[in-house]
Amino acid sequence: MPRRTATLEDVARRGRVPADGLRRVLNRPEVVSARTREQVIRAMQALHYVPNRSAQLLAGKAAPSIGLITASVTLHAPSQIAAAIKSHASLHQLEVAIAMPAQADFVALQARLDELRAQHIRGVIVSLPLESATAERLVQDNPDMACLFLDVSPEADVCCVRFDHRDGCGACVRHLWEMGHREFGLLAGPESSVSARLRLASWREALHSLNIARSTTVFGDWSAASGWQKTFELLHLQPRISAIVVANDQMALGVLSALAQLNRSGSQAVSVTGYDDTADSLYFQPPLTTVAQDFDLLGKRAVERLIALMAAPQLRIRELLPTRLIVRQSAWPVAAAEDRQQTLAQLKALVEKL
């Protein structure tokens, strides 16, 4: 007969520690006496309790770890960043403990930092858009924790590695302008998002530099569904829009779907650009013109800079990574759309003559 797997309750009885007390021991080992810690470890060993993360920490046998506080990995960009960080951390024999707060406010973030601290983690990468004041307070209130931020404004007085939003957004706008577009729709991310506001400001700055004073702006929530919905809103607000600049690839997917549903082709065709160059964007219909952010490079730099910061907390790390415009088939010259419509009309006339 197979042996029953030992539970935490079994360990508590064997070690003569109350069940609630045992859970506190596992969650906060640094506040437990050496005698109690040894008592719990002996009970786990006697019962052949399957070592989990907490037991390893108690025994001091866990692999060195860093923390990653990130937005939901159901979104493509955060999931790719998390994968890159884990991959490069493993090259340094580091494990990555991931925390995903429901909100990006100070209280929620501090709670996640406390959980990571309880796992003996002393270095954290924060990969979600944060207000400058929130990021700065996290650093000030946690002097024992090395914090590196990936999505803060240029004004934030914290250590960061981030992409150059201004360069990428400007490249998109200039590319469309060079193809004759003058009526722009701007589909931004949530107004509460720092990165969304930075991209929107960069688009508007680029449009202003090209003497385009008017554009129509709506705000989505990063999802394809919101991209689909907001396309109808944009075209209702300004039917003459010839190009829609979108703050991420997932919303751009929704935009392309809505335009296909509206049969916006020929002289009514609307060019679309995205942002992120996620793995799927090449296979959108049509393939998406977008701004590439090298997430693998971001993961590599983030891990390297966090290791350096943990070794020398006095370092001031502020690194800006380049972006790159990827030109595909979702954006075309205004004249080209009109030419296609004329070609179709000519072909139709020829067919009717046959």
UniProtKB/Swiss-Prot annotation:
Domain HTH lacI-type: 6-60
InterPro entries from the UniProt entry: HTH_LacI, LacI/GalR-like_sensor, Lambda_DNA-bd_dom_sf, Peripla_BP_I
GO molecular function: DNA-binding transcription factor activity; transcription cis-regulatory region binding
Classification lineage: Bacteria, Pseudomonadati, Pseudomonadota, Gammaproteobacteria, Enterobacterales
Disulphides: none
Function: Repressor of the lactose operon. Binds lactose as an inducer.
Transmembrane segments: none
DNA-binding region: 8-27
Assembly: Homotetramer.
Protein name: Lactose operon repressor
Keywords from the UniProt entry: DNA-binding, Repressor, Transcription, Transcription regulation
Superkingdom of the source species: Bacteria
